[in-house]
Amino acid sequence: MHPSTVRREAERVKVSVRVRPLNERENNAPEGTKVTVAAKQAAAVVTVKVLGGSNNSGAAESMGTARRVAQDFQFDHVFWSVETPDACGATPATQADVFRTIGYPLVQHAFDGFNSCLFAYGQTGSGKTYTMMGADVSALSGEGNGVTPRICLEIFARKASVEAQGHSRWIVELGYVEVYNERVSDLLGKRKKGVKGGGEEVYVDVREHPSRGVFLEGQRLVEVGSLDDVVRLIEIGNGVRHTASTKMNDRSSRSHAIIMLLLREERTMTTKSGETIRTAGKSSRMNLVDLAGSERVAQSQVEGQQFKEATHINLSLTTLGRVIDVLADMATKGAKAQYSVAPFRDSKLTFILKDSLGGNSKTFMIATVSPSALNYEETLSTLRYASRARDIVNVAQVNEDPRARRIRELEEQMEDMRQAMAGGDPAYVSELKKKLALLESEAQKRAADLQALEREREHNQVQERLLRATEAEKSELESRAAALQEEMTATRRQADKMQALNLRLKEEQARKERELLKEMAKKDAALSKVRRRKDAEIASEREKLESTVAQLEREQREREVALDALQTHQRKLQEALESSERTAAERDQLLQQLTELQSERTQLSQVVTDRERLTRDLQRIQYEYGETELARDVALCAAQEMEARYHAAVFHLQTLLELATEWEDALRERALAERDEAAAAELDAAASTSQNARESACERLTSLEQQLRESEERAAELASQLEATAAAKSSAEQDRENTRATLEQQLRESEARAAELASQLEATAAAKMSAEQDRENTRATLEQQLRDSEERAAELASQLESTTAAKMSAEQDRESTRATLEQQLRDSEERAAELASQLESTTAAKMSAEQDRESTRATLEQQLRESEERAAELASQLESTTAAKMSAEQDRESTRATLEQQLRDSEERAAELASQLEATAAAKSSAEQDRENTRAALEQQLRDSEERAAELASQ
């Protein structure tokens, strides 16, 4: 008897279609409630109705013909899940119906040893995740659970039933990955704890093996024993899977998710001695794929990161469509097909599904569509792809080791023989027992050999892993040593850079200090010059003011003397009028003189008014002088504040430089002391901090320079104000000179008038005799006029007294103003002395800062020497590490030699086992031939016995 060949089955991809109910968005849209899809579940036919009207005028022109012609699509199964019955009146399909039709056969194929695959394809929001997972993705249990949890539940029920028979046990492992933006991420991979959002992604690589096929390198597979374990792992994966809300779907999958179930059978056999032999049996892989839905950007209205995700999703689905077209074309046309190789490697999704499409797998596809007219084009496109996928033919084979398959066949033969032995002829039963014993011994021997080979293979795999680990450790040590050397070089280079930068900063600081001191010296000199010039101008103005006041007083005294002379002359006239009689001509002349005296008195009143105006002008000049002094004080205060800010900035810069120096020293020591990546990160962070401190110092220096410029602008503004004040003062002086000239002109005119009056008085004395006749007539009138003149003179006297009092008040104000100015001058001198003392203290502080800087430089040099000593220690440690590495390499070489010797021994043992197996096979063939001959002889004897028995019976 020869071993049977591997069991292979060729069949098409099973394609099903599920039509979901209308959702809320479609019910609220004007055309959303219009159903364009009809289905016959019994006949597995889907009909896309004619879409009439012009409401969809914005659709693509390429769909125009499809809109005007109804199309029928034939599939393997159709699930009508709309609330109303289908075209034949059948009730809507439930989740349980989908599982009975699709999920149950998948479980049967898995336990038969066939690879299988189920993937959901369709537009976004068409119900793929609901069909695969269920109504609530976070709770995969209950009546609404999808195909995936139902398949897992059936697997565990079948597993318990098989293991109850006691011949084998099944091991189930689960993996969960997603394809996001053309990168494969392990959703069950170990992530860092305590990181928001699950931590970083755990990416795996897609590889292809000649015998294993496509697999994921580095994927984490977790053994599961119940549905609760599966639900827990899937919920963990869903927690880190990429989903988002779009216009089409509140929870849209932004990646393709694949749940991988691996089933491995472990068969057991008990020998006559009671030893239990365990061998590998069948194995299978089941891929449950939840594809991300295709979406139109105009409908889903995604942007930013979601737009990028939609681009990758549509690209991978387009590649899947191309693969389906190529495989379908190859299956239908054979050698005449346009392409001979499908573009699996154009996308990670199609590369993973390579065995499921046209390979070693029994594949089921479920296409989900929407019945609404809003999704007419997407529904029609999905149905076309699904119909095209039905043409793909897969050739699936049972995944079982040939030796294990032979053992299983022997066990099946032994079971058949045990059943044949029940109630049979004793001789035949005895013969069968002998054959059964031979078969059992052969099966046990094969099982033992297979177990030994498996153990040997496992041992070799362990040795290979150890060898690879040793090589990896060596390369890791070498790379670590190189990285350490590079790190030390970079650290030393960084320390040199930091030292050079520190020197540059110190030089820059010294230069800035010198420039600021020069600028301050210039500003002080300019302010001193301006102060001296203003003091000289104020002194000259004070002298001019005093001379003007003295001149005005002198003029006032002269006017008082002239007024006294006029009064004396008036008294003389009155006496002349009283003592003699005047003529009418004298009277007229006297009246004329009296009129002239009155006009002269008016002129004197005008002179008094002018004097009062001059007094007010003097007061205004004094007020402007006070304002000028106040502005000068403000300028001095601003200069003092600017100087104080400068000193504070210098102190702040020195503090920052000291801190930067301390940071750099600490960083240099830490960089030389530590050799791992964390220290390098701290060095970068500290360097960044130092750089920020330097930038802050530069910004502070810039702000100080800006303040200095503002102070200069303020000083210039004050200088312009002082110039304007000087111009106003010059204008006032000019007005005063003009007034003085006018008063002098009026005084000369008064003197000329007095001379004229004197001449007139002489003429009057000459004419007195002729006027005595009219004196008596005019005496009464003159007496009345005299009384008026006396009253007017009294008024003039009172006005003169008030003018004298005003003059005294002006003198007092002048004295007080002079005292105030002298006090301000003394305060300015005291302030200048204070500024000089502050400048001396600043110079002393600068000398102290220079001494501190020198001490800091000495400390830095000492720390640099210590750092160099530390570098020497590190170099010695590196040499010891190199020596240890050489020792480890020698140990590794000896280990490698030992492993190679063990490997050669294993190969020799394998050769011996192979020769023994060949001898066993030859002996087995001879035994089988003898057994066949014996069987033929026994059968001949049995026939002879039966004939003999028949003859005896007939007799």
Curated annotation (Swiss-Prot):
It comes from the Eukaryota. GO terms for biological process: microtubule-based movement; mitotic spindle assembly; spindle elongation. InterPro entries: KIF11-like (IPR047149), Kinesin_motor_CS (IPR019821), Kinesin_motor_dom (IPR001752), Kinesin_motor_dom_sf (IPR036961), P-loop_NTPase (IPR027417). Belongs to the TRAFAC class myosin-kinesin ATPase superfamily. Kinesin family. Residues 682-712, 725-955 are annotated as: Disordered. SUPFAM superfamilies: P-loop containing nucleoside triphosphate hydrolases (SSF52540). The gene is KIN. ATP binds at G122, Q123, T124, G125, S126, G127, K128, T129. Sequence repeats lie at residues 704-742, 743-781, 782-820, 821-859, 860-898, 899-937, 938-955. Residues 426-955 form a coiled coil. Residues 12-392 form the Kinesin motor domain. It holds the Pfam family Kinesin. GO terms for molecular function: ATP binding; microtubule binding; plus-end-directed microtubule motor activity. PANTHER family: KINESIN FAMILY MEMBER 11, KINESIN-LIKE PROTEIN KIF11. This is Kinesin-like protein K39. The keyword Coiled coil applies. Residues 704-955 are annotated as: 7 X 39 AA approximate tandem repeats.
